[in-house]
């Protein structure tokens, strides 16, 4: 949120002074994080207010792992509270700062999950003795949605040298709809994420205060419930990580059911990374710690890095 404040307030149309803007920058660089409740306001203005409180030496903030009074946090970082001038209190409460901040985090997570879904889906296709026929470049070319094409290309790249797919070639005429239509499902998701990212990039580089300062008076539209929608998207991305974690754990366990576990180079890398946190399960055991561990790997983009190190860059 503080980074978004710098983007929004630094446009030159808000009337904020440079020293006030500089304090936000210095707080970020010093690792001062205001304690901001995520609920409790009609709309979203309370969130920004808690940041402003620390800037004037009130409220609470964390610094070097310790939660302190706002004034003490500033003091330990060698900073001084600001005395707000004309319009600056309003600036710190107005605009779409929290909306844009939550949406930015949601978009980043969505990008991570989109590529991780390609990875988990490839692993699933292999352990279910699937076929790459539905991912054929010729099929993609006659319905040339770019993101659908990219998804199919990712799956082909991960599974291109799979001994398991070769052993079970012709095992069935075609895979289940949920498997063979991964490009048609995951591709539009990529497009939706890209469209949202383009809109967000404009918003991030906008001036969103009300009123704005021009040579001639002007106004702007107000987005109602924007923060609720952005936070809901962010929370949804968090829950989706657990779904992909469960899929990866099931994929790994399915591979362990085979006597011959030889698989594609890409999926072997996925399996090895998975097994670094999750053991082979030969009896009942609590799964929560393993779900948390794999979810953290997903958050850290570990599966994306591992697969790209094995088969090359994935397409988004």
Residue ranges and their predicted role:
Residues 43:
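Long C-terminal interaction/binding lobes of large macromolecular proteins
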Residues 3-6, 24-29:
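Transmembrane helical cores of multi-pass ion-transport proteins
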Residues 38-40:
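Cysteine-centered functional microenvironments
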């Amino acid at each position: 949120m503080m980074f978004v404040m710098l983007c929004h307030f630094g446009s030159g149309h808000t009337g904020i002074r440079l020293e006030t803007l500089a304090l936000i920058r210095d707080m970020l660089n010093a690792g001062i994080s205001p304690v901001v409740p995520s609920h409790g306001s009609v709309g979203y203005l309370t969130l920004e207010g808690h940041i402003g409180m620390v800037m004037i030496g009130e409220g609470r903030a964390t610094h070097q792992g310790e939660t302190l009074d706002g004034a003490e946090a500033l003091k330990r970082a060698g900073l001084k509270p600001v005395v707000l001038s004309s319009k600056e209190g309003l600036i710190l409460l107005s605009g779409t700062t929290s909306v844009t901040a939550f949406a930015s985090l949601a978009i980043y997570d969505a990008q991570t999950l989109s590529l991780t879904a390609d990875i988990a889906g490839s692993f699933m296709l292999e352990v279910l003795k699937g076929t790459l026929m539905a991912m054929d470049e010729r099929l993609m070319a006659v319905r040339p949605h770019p993101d659908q094409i990219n998804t199919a290309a990712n799956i082909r790249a991960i599974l291109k040298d799979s001994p398991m797919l070769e052993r079970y070639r012709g095992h069935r005429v075609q895979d289940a709809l949920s498997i063979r239509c991964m490009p048609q499902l995951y591709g539009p998701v990529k497009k939706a994420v890209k469209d949202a990212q383009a809109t967000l990039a404009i918003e991030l580089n906008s001036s969103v205060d009300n009123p704005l300062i021009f040579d001639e008076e002007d106004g702007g539209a107000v987005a109602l419930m924007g923060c609720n929608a952005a936070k809901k998207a962010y929370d949804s991305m968090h829950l989706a990580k657990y779904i992909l974690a469960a899929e990866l754990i099931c994929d790994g366990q399915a591979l362990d059911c085979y006597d011959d576990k030889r698989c594609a180079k890409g999926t072997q890398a996925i399996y090895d990374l998975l097994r670094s946190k999750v053991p082979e399960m030969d009896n009942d055991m609590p799964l929560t710690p393993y779900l948390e561990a794999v979810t953290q790997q997903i958050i850290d983009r570990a599966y994306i890095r591992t697969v790209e190190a094995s088969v090359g860059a994935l397409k988004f």
